[in-house]
């Protein structure tokens, strides 16, 4: 049985965290943070987080500060972030996307929208990781083939030089 993907839910409202877990169901393992500072602590310790659901408006450290730290460590290259926030202004949405979020869901939201967008983000990042692995494997294979070709060519040149430098025997 495959291990469940881990989702970090960052929201200062315990009710919101519980609601998101209930919407997403038992197919995931959940980590919870009540503020941005706690989220960063968890992200520093855990390398197996598949997705972050992030509220923007929180005490101590807001969602934008969390995104800034994630950018500094390039965590968003590996972990998609979906903002779920009651922030109404378009500037917040634009700023969140500029900071690298995979998606933005405004509250109030429909259950099916949250479920679908989480699945889509996880699927897209899994495909991206698989493509990155394939490209990396191809680069290593080409590099290995190039080294092998250089070795063969150097032996051919060496044999040619030996053949050229030998005195020709006349009969």
Question: What function would you assign to each model-found segment?
Answer:
Residues 91, 109-118:
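C-terminal output helix
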Residues 163-171:
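Single conserved hydrophobic/aromatic residue that forms the stacking wall/gate
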Residues 58:
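Receiver (REC) domain active-site loop signature in two-component systems and cognate sites
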């Amino acid at each position: 049985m495959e291990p469940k993907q881990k989702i970090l839910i960052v929201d200062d409202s315990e009710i919101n965290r519980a609601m998101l877990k209930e919407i997403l169901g038992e197919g995931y393992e959940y980590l919870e943070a009540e503020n941005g500072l706690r989220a960063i602590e968890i992200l520093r310790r855990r390398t197996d987080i598949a997705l972050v659901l992030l509220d923007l408006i929180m005490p101590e450290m807001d969602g934008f500060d969390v995104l800034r730290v994630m950018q500094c460590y390039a965590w968003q290259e590996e972990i998609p972030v979906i903002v779920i926030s009651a922030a109404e202004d378009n500037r917040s949405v634009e700023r969140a996307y500029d900071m690298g979020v995979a998606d933005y869901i405004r509250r109030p939201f429909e259950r099916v929208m949250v479920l679908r967008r989480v699945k889509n983000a996880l699927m897209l990042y899994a495909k991206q990781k698989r493509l990155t692995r394939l490209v990396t494997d191809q680069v290593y294979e080409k590099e290995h083939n190039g080294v092998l070709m250089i070795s063969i060519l150097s032996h051919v040149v060496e044999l040619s030089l030996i053949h050229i430098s030998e005195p020709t025997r006349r009969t």
